[in-house]
Amino acid sequence: MSKKFTMTLLSSSLAGLLVMSGGVSAQNGTYSVLQDDSQKSGPVKYGSTYEVVKTVDNGNFRYEVKEKKNDKRTLFKFDSEGNVTVKGKGITHTLHDPALKDFARTAEGKKNEQNGNTPPHKLTDSAVRGVYNKVYGLEKTEITGFSVEDGENGKVSLGSDAKASGEFSVAVGNGARATEKASTAVGSWAAADGKQSTALGVGTYAYANASTALGSVAFVDNTATYGTAAGNRAKVDKDATEGTALGAKATVTNKNSVALGANSVTTRDNEVYIGYKTGTESDKTYGTRVLGGLSDGTRNSDAATVGQLNRKVGGVYDDVKARITVESEKQKKYTDQKTSEVNEKVEARTTVGVDSDGKLTRAEGATKTIAVNDGLVALSGRTDRIDYAVGAIDGRVTRNTQSIEKNSKAIAANTRTLQQHSARLDSQQRQINENHKEMKRAAAQSAALTGLFQPYSVGKFNATAAVGGYSDQQALAVGVGYRFNEQTAAKAGVAFSDGDASWNVGVNFEF
């Protein structure tokens, strides 16, 4: 050790004295502190204001800084790592100073020998005054609104009137409360009153067990177990167990249902509803959204796209058109055939002529001549048969025409149905695009939260901010933390992106 690092024994009778008492050994020595100008040039100078007393307790070194005057008043104590433990009002702080650590390493022989005019350590009068001023300030600092309960079921509360009464509960914010086991409330007047419940945001309420409320004034009813409400004034209402409300003023009133999007309201159990409420409580009118970006459905439970329906209906239309064409050709051929047969029969008729007295004057195409009246009767009968045949043909043509009209109406109805499906699919496409943006915002928020720092120094609060991004979305995260001692620290963070928010709260235990 350097000769410049002098050690002055209080008296020769104390040199090498070893005192044994109750199994604890102690060895005392007094060390000098450097003057402020000793590190500039010239011989090393030692001050007359402060001294350091070294003790050894079961192999652990402790150093006590005292004034040389004023009855050797103790200013502070530090360990071999340069840490000063300060007991303030309501909390214990740990202060670290590099000059103290350098002094301890020199006193314990852990530094290389110093030669010439180089000071053996960095502890000067001004360094002692600086540390003492910090110690004095911390001793006089009173922290209110902060509480940590020691033990296996520790509870943490931070903020005016904050209350954490459940096991492993955390309450952060003015008037925040966490009353059940493993509950967490972060934000002014946030309330987590269910077991394993989480409330994050100003005025959020997570009343049910295993419920989560995120966003200003988000609410989960105490009967809606496993409910999740995320968004400004989002709500999971009475008996809506396992309900999820995502979006500003989204409301779930049914079991195992999801209200997706701002102002969306569920209408039945086991439903995902993306429509939004547009009217008052009395008229209960709803708007629609487009769910976009869908692939063609392949299973019976999958949604079909407009393109998929168009292709299917196009095939049906082509098939119907082909069948109508074939049937029309058949009917035309049949009509032509029957008309030809009638024409042949008409051409084979018997032509007769009569005079003014009604007597037969000629008979063409007949093997026998008959009376005019008989001939007219026979001709009338043949004409009736011709009329009957033509009437039958007209009936068939009429039926074909009716069938064609019926098919045309069916095709028109199918076209209207396709147009309705197209409108619904357009709404679904728009909603999927919004969901895609929401997922990218969530990823950006997660990246920002990852960038928040944990407090490292004991007794120190830290406020930290970070930014994160994913694809074309960015997020800002802010957080606070506090290290209670070398083994325990806690932090909380909130990330914001385009009106959405996510959060985390963590407690760290080191062994």
Swiss-Prot record:
The residue ranges crossing the membrane are 461-471, 474-485, 488-497, 501-511
- Spans annotated as Required to bind IgA: 329-344
Induction per the UniProt record: In strain ECOR 9 expression is greater at 37 than 27 degrees Celsius and increases upon entry into stationary phase (at protein level). Upon expression from a plasmid in strain AB1157 (with its own leader sequence) more protein is seen at 37 than 27 degrees Celsius (at protein level).
A Pfam family recorded for this sequence: YadA_anchor
Q: What is its main location?
A: other
Q: How does it sit in the membrane?
A: Multi-pass membrane protein
Ranges where the record places region Head domain: 161-287
Question: A biological process (GO) annotation for this entry?
Answer: protein secretion by the type V secretion system
Question: Region labeled Surface exposed passenger domain — which residues?
Answer: 27-417
Q: Where is this region: Required to bind IgG?
A: 384-418
Query: Which region ranges are annotated with the description Translocator domain?
Result: 461-511
Region Outer membrane translocation of the passenger domain, as annotated, extends over 418-460
Q: What does this protein do?
A: Binds (in a non-immune fashion) to the Fc portion of human IgA and IgG; binding occurs on the cell surface. Confers the ability to survive exposure to human serum exposure. Binds to the Fc portion of human IgG, IgA and to whole mouse antibodies also via Fc. Upon overexpression cells acquire an extra cell surface layer that forms a zipper-like contact between cells; cells autoagglutinate and form biofilm more readily, suggesting it may play a role in defense against a host.
User: What does the miscellaneous comment read?
Assistant: Encoded in a prophage region of strain ECOR 9, upon UV treatment bacteriophage containing this gene can be isolated.
For domains, the record's comment is: The signal peptide, cleaved at the inner membrane, guides the autotransporter protein to the periplasmic space. Then, trimerization and insertion of the C-terminal translocator domain in the outer membrane forms a hydrophilic pore for the translocation of the passenger domain to the bacterial cell surface. The crystallized passenger domain (residues 161-440) is an entwined, elongated trimer with a head domain, a neck and 2 extended coiled-coil regions of differing handedness separated by a saddle region.
Q: What is this protein called?
A: Immunoglobulin-binding protein EibD
Upper classification of the source organism reads:
Bacteria, Pseudomonadati, Pseudomonadota, Gammaproteobacteria, Enterobacterales
